[in-house]
């Protein structure tokens, strides 16, 4: 690559990172809006807590299955087009959800939304590994991963604003649907599948593959399956991911509800507290990626061990916090949980991509997705039942314990190498 090509590549790389971050954030806006709408839906008797918990669980499981299946296809197809279709369909499902009052249709539209949401991350994982060199991936992909937090914060902030303006829960679906439709158009025209779509040469990976990175390499489906399913590090991280997502969605899906029921904080203030959780997550995500590259030489699993430990302690601290404690104390503990839990959330995708190489990055992240979103069996209906029959104290204690279990799985993978490129080329 010439000096001129290198300069053009860096500009195009950051343009891709920014554009794909914006597009992916709108997947979250059309997913996390439900957590803000649900307190009013429950209060008005539009839906029961058990039905809502079941919908959240099935939605999450199907989302995980979708990421798994679409991970296979995203490695083969154009990521830009794949992502655009998923975002457009998510916008449609949100609009339809806002139009109905029947529980069966709530379930149908949100479950289909779970599938279309799974068309977002796998193509991004593939495209990122084609745009970013493995030696920079932890830092730059961690920056990209803040799109999760920005998207969630935008959903919470937007819905809080709509409630403050006196608009009902339906507008929490109409407005995000309209914005996501515009974002789908933006994605189609601005996100690039790889350097080739910008007229640039592909990344040279000969230094990490351990031999010439020939352009004529042929990768079969059997090769991709071997890279993913015969890698013990990917399996350990997938198991750990289950517990990462229990903690993450325990707070995201139920945060506004338990703050209202458990602490007596109204939905608007509770939404702002969860926004603080997400903003702390942005800082934590970037910090985790930076520490991984600078302190642990790209070994993201080691960063995850410490993050899960402190995330668990923060969650347990929230459980220990007495009723009537100042709201700023609860906010700080929420922010601490967000800061630490989003490190593993981002790094697991990076570790999967590094271990499976850019030949199977989408498939590996699809596998991570199905394991992570299987956690909604706990964070959805599980938390609903625990909070109903045992109270929010028991629910928060459980979330803290799950974080520490996840830490143990990461410990088993402590000695993992930073990437799987040399092993794949052997």
Q: In which residue ranges do the predicted regions lie?
A:
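C-terminal ends and interior cores of transmembrane alpha-helices
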Residues: 88-101, 309-323
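Extracytoplasmic gate region of multi-pass secondary transporters
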Residues: 34-36, 231-286, 345, 379
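Helix-loop-helix hairpin linking two adjacent transmembrane segments in secondary transporters
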Residues: 144-195
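Cytoplasmic helix-loop-helix junction between adjacent transmembrane helices
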Residues: 109-150
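Conserved MFS/SLC helix-loop-helix module at the cytosolic interface between two early adjacent transmembrane helices
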Residues: 65-104
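Residue-level signature of mid-helix packing/kink "hotspots" within the transmembrane helices
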Residues: 32, 60-68, 152-153, 278-286, ...
